[in-house]
A protein has these predicted regions:
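Non-catalytic terminal accessory segments
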Residues: 1-127
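Canonical alpha-helical transmembrane segment with a positive-inside/aromatic-interface signature
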Residues: 102-146, 150-152, 158-163
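Generic structural hydrophobic/aromatic packing signal, biased to beta-strands
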Residues: 25-26, 120, 136, 256, ...
Length: 363
């Protein structure tokens, strides 16, 4: 709860700072001057007050509350700095931002219209459910594993912003794929362990011949991993934290391994330990590893893991797939898509939901 208040205060101050810039630059252009600036600023601040009022209530506010409370708050955090930067560029370019400056008004209108269009595209992208089908080719694949179908779900981030309808759509897509094995690679919940209940409500009953396996993500750790762990096991999932289990398909024995997450403090049971994860796997054993954070892949690859499934990055929620670029690319060695090293492969799932702002483009 303290962390929630701290984040809320930071965002409130961020909002105020952005609106000081916006007001100072664009006040002469806006009809009504400072009064209009204050009204617009209040529309951005009001949702944060509503979020305070919502503390302690059910993790699932109504659709109407999500519409006026959660969405405007996060979109404001995304677009306010863009609007402020736009104003600075306008001044630097010498646009006449005086009260009678027609060019300034046109520029403001075009900028606001462009941002509104971008917001709609991003919102549509965040609501869109995409099923990606990939063929994974492995050298010297045991014959018994040929054609095995794995469904990976990652980064659902179930929380106040998540609709049950969306969760039902995801569950239906998983069933339709008729997988041999289901891998849930972390961040099942967003901020609160209690949100594992609506997650369980949507996915209880999912099954696959080889099993349903889940691992922790950083948000599961933040929310309280012990409670999330118990909730996942209660719905019949096999939870893997720094351990591997043997499975058999068509007479071929192989291993599914799951790591902890770097969000866990060193020495805690949920902190990643690759050595312990693979301790039970023989040197010749074919292994599929589940690791929420792709930063763990190099260590897994060094130990001969054939395939690693990760998530975490969301591809930065803004990406240009054809160029292999995402908003996360400048910050992460492995940010999106497929990677290969010394016979080991990594696939990074873009995530089944969004984090924070309901905005995704190209992801």
């Amino acid at each position: 709860m303290k962390a929630y208040w701290r984040i809320l205060v930071i965002l409130f101050l961020w909002t105020a700072a952005c609106w000081l810039v916006i007001g100072g630059l664009l006040r002469p252009v806006l009809p009504g001057g400072w009064l209009t600036v204050l009204v617009l600023a209040s529309l951005c601040v009001a949702p944060s007050l509503g979020m305070v009022r919502n503390l302690g209530r059910s993790a699932y506010p109504s659709a109407l509350r999500r519409l006026w409370l959660v969405r405007p708050f996060w979109y404001a955090q995304l677009f306010m700095p863009l609007l402020a930067v736009f104003g600075v560029i306008g001044v630097a370019a010498g646009l006449p931002f005086g009260a009678g400056g027609l060019a300034g008004r046109w520029a403001l209108g075009l900028g606001a219209g462009g941002l509104a269009g971008l917001a709609l595209l991003g919102y549509a992208g965040a609501r869109r459910l995409v099923v990606r089908r990939l063929d994974v080719r492995v050298d010297d694949l045991p014959a018994g594993l040929a054609g095995m179908r794995i469904v990976q779900i990652s980064d659902l981030h179930v929380g106040p912003h998540t609709s049950r309808r969306h969760l039902a759509r995801v569950a239906a897509a998983v069933r339709e794929a008729r997988p041999d094995l289901i891998a849930v690679t972390g961040d099942q919940v967003d901020d609160h362990a209690r949100d594992v209940e609506p997650f369980a409500e949507a996915f209880r009953g999912l099954s696959a011949p080889l099993g349903v396996f889940a691992i922790p993500g950083n948000h599961d750790v933040y929310a309280g991993w012990k409670a999330v762990h118990q909730g996942l096991e209660a719905m019949g999932m096999t939870v893997l934290v720094n351990r591997a289990v043997p499975l058999e398909r068509n007479g071929t024995r192989f291993w599914v391994a799951g790591t902890g997450d770097p969000a866990g403090r060193r020495g805690s049971p949920v902190a990643p330990d690759v050595e312990r994860t693979l301790a039970a796997v023989p040197p010749e054993g074919f292994t599929i590893a589940l690791a929420h954070n792709p930063a763990l892949w190099p260590a897994l690859a060094e130990r001969g893991v054939e395939l690693t499934l990760s998530g975490h990055t969301h591809y930065g929620q803004i990406a240009i797939p054809r160029l292999g670029w995402s908003l996360a690319s400048p910050f992460l060695e492995h940010a999106m898509g497929r990677h290969q090293r010394d016979g080991s492969q990594l696939y990074i799932n873009p995530g089944t939901n969004y984090w924070g702002i309901p905005f995704r483009l190209g992801t």
